[in-house]
Design a protein with these regions (language model features):
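Acidic, mature catalytic/reactive cores of soluble proteins
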Residues: 1-277
Length: 277
C-alpha cells in the first residue's frame, strides 16, 4: 500500500484544508489529479500494475520544525487523494514517480537506475562544491538560467552575474557561462537587465545588473582568451548598455557630468538587498 501526501501550493506558503476537485483520471499504472482548477495535473505512477483507491482524506497539522525555528507558519494540511495497492514479493523493488507529465511505467526502473548512476558522489570538499554548483544551473524554456536560492528564489539578474564565473568558469564550463549570458540578454531593455523574472513578468529595478554582466563578461574573456570573438558576439549589446547608461534610462539611472553613475526613484529599490538610497 502506497499513500502519497500532496500539498499543491507555492513554495512560499503552506497548504490548508479547502475546496478541492474530487476526481482522478486513470493513466497507465497510475492516476493524474488536479487539486485546483488553475494548477497543473499531478501524474502519479508506479512501475508495476496497481489499483488506485480514491479517498481524498486530509492529514492535519503536519509540522515543519525549520519553519518553526524561523518564526514562520509551520503547520500544513496535506491531502491524500488515495492510495495504490499492489502485490509485492520479498526483495522486489517498486519505483514510484510523481510529476507534471505522464511517463511510461515500463521505463521507470531504468530511469531510476540511470539517475542513480549519473549522480556524482561526494568524495571531498571540492566535489561537494562542484555538486552544489551544478544544482543552481537549470535549463528552462528561455534557456540556461541560474537559481538565486533554494527554495525561495527563482532567477535574479544581479545574483546570476555575481555567481556566474564561480559556477561555470571555475568548473571549466565556459559554454554554460556563455549560454547563461545569452539567456539573460534576451530580456535586455533600454540598457537594463532584469532584476527578477523574465519576459512579460520581468522587473527591471536594478541599477547594477547590467554592470555585473560586464564583470562576468570580463571573466569570460580572460578565461577563453577570445576577445575578438567576444566583441563580435556581444559588442552590440555592450554598446547598447553603455549608451543607455550615458544618456539615461529607467528609474533616473544616468551618467553625471563627472562621469559617475547616478540613479534613484522614490519608493523603488535599485540596489542590493532592496535598499532604497
Amino acid at each position: 500500500k502506497l499513500e502519497p501526501f500532496t500539498a499543491f501550493r507555492n513554495y512560499h506558503s503552506v497548504g490548508k484544508v479547502g475546496r478541492i476537485h474530487q476526481d482522478v483520471n486513470s493513466i497507465e499504472n497510475g492516476v493524474s489529479y488536479q487539486m485546483y482548477r488553475d494548477f497543473d495535473s499531478l501524474h502519479m505512477q508506479v512501475s508495476k500494475e496497481a489499483h488506485f483507491m480514491p479517498t481524498f482524506e486530509w492529514n492535519y497539522d503536519n509540522e515543519y520544525l525549520r519553519e518553526l525555528d524561523r518564526g514562520y507558519d509551520f503547520k500544513e494540511d496535506l491531502l491524500t487523494p488515495g492510495y495504490f495497492s499492489m502485490l509485492m514479493h520479498p526483495g522486489e523493488e517498486i519505483v514510484f514517480s510523481a510529476g507534471t507529465s505522464e511517463l511510461v511505467p515500463s521505463q521507470l526502473q531504468s530511469l531510476f537506475a540511470s539517475e542513480l548512476k549519473n549522480r556524482k558522489k561526494i568524495t571531498d570538499f571540492e566535489s561537494a562544491l562542484d555538486i552544489a554548483a551544478e544544482q543552481f544551473i537549470s535549463e528552462t524554456k528561455k534557456g540556461t538560467e541560474i537559481t538565486a536560492g533554494f527554495h525561495w528564489f527563482g532567477r535574479w539578474g544581479r545574483d546570476t552575474f555575481i555567481s556566474l564565473p564561480g559556477l561555470t568558469l571555475s568548473r571549466k564550463q565556459p559554454h554554460v557561462c556563455k549560454s547563461v549570458m545569452n539567456t539573460m540578454l534576451q530580456d535586455l531593455r533600454d540598457g537594463l537587465l532584469t532584476n527578477v523574472g523574465a519576459g512579460e513578468e520581468a522587473r527591471y529595478n536594478s541599477a547594477d545588473a547590467s554592470l555585473w554582466f560586464f564583470w562576468s563578461l570580463q571573466k569570460y574573456a580572460a578565461h577563453t582568451k577570445n576577445t575578438k570573438g567576444l566583441w563580435v558576439e556581444f559588442g552590440d549589446r555592450i554598446k547598447e548598455i553603455v549608451e543607455s547608461y550615458r544618456k539615461g534610462t529607467w528609474y533616473n539611472i544616468h551618467m553625471t557630468e563627472d562621469g559617475l553613475l547616478w540613479g534613484g526613484q522614490e519608493d523603488v529599490a535599485l540596489t542590493w538587498m532592496d535598499a532604497m538610497v
